[in-house]
């Protein structure tokens, strides 16, 4: 059994080229038993992995899945192999109860129910890919998205931020070097993250999702992503927003 995750340009720091990075990640496949014929490639990296496989390597593809589902499906496949159906069912029950409810990772911490405004803290998202995938999680909703970025970005040739069209506002600190892909959002620059509250007061309305998914490391303003996430949550709660 082998699980390969996160083959994306912002992870190539130590490999010089993207091809070297993919080759290094897929080396684990050489340790698999040759007697096993079925291989599953789950998610959006199939093409990158497939070209590193032997020609007689039989695979079954499950593609077009969002990042969180890729991780969950990979863990599910591993659970089946290790513990069979009984352990797999326990895993499913656990996921239903705890999936993406960890602090600073798509953490829903506040909601105005009457106005239908929900606030998410995703401070742990420190690269473009994590942010891009986070915005896709709201595609099916009727809410308008407000994305808040922050931090020191990783710059690579292939790396850019791709937003789901549901996000109509993007708030960016002036000192953040950001590379946006195609989008239809209004870009709002703020002098510093401490000025966030002033901007939010102007754009908050109703039927909205407010996503603090940063796209960069926290060290220019905070000790770590946890302190940054707590800062955002405290900022929102201190606004004492009314739900009437």
Can you name each region flagged by the protein language model?
Residues 215-241:
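Glycine/aspartate-rich loop-and-adjacent alpha/beta segment that forms the canonical ThDP
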Residues 2-5, 21, 75, 122, ...:
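Residue-level signal for inorganic ion chemistry
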Residues 65-167:
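Nucleotide phosphate-binding/pyrophosphate-handling subdomain across enzymes
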């Amino acid at each position: 059994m082998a699980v390969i995750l996160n083959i994306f340009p912002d992870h190539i720091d130590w490999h010089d080229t993207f091809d070297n990075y993919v080759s290094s990640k897929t080396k684990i496949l050489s340790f698999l038993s040759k007697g096993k014929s079925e291989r599953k490639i789950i998610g959006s990296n199939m093409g990158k992995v497939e070209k590193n496989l032997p020609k007689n390597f039989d695979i079954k593809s499950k593609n077009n899945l969002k990042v969180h589902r890729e991780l969950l499906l990979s863990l599910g496949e591993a659970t089946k192999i290790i513990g069979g159906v009984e352990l797999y069912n326990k895993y499913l029950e656990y996921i239903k109860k705890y999936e993406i409810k960890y602090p600073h990772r798509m953490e829903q911490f506040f909601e105005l129910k009457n106005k239908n405004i929900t606030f998410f803290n995703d401070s742990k998202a420190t690269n473009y890919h994590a942010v891009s995938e986070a915005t896709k999680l709201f595609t099916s909703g009727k809410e308008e998205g407000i994305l808040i970025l922050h931090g020191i970005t990783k710059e690579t040739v292939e790396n850019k931020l791709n937003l789901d069209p549901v996000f109509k506002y993007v708030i960016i600190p002036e000192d953040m070097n950001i590379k946006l892909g195609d989008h239809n959002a209004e870009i709002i620059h703020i002098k510093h993250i401490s000025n966030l509250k002033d901007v939010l007061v102007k754009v908050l309305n109703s039927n909205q999702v407010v996503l603090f998914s940063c796209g960069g490391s926290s060290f220019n303003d905070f000790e770590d992503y946890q302190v940054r996430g707590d800062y955002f949550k405290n900022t929102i709660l201190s606004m004492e927003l009314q739900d009437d």
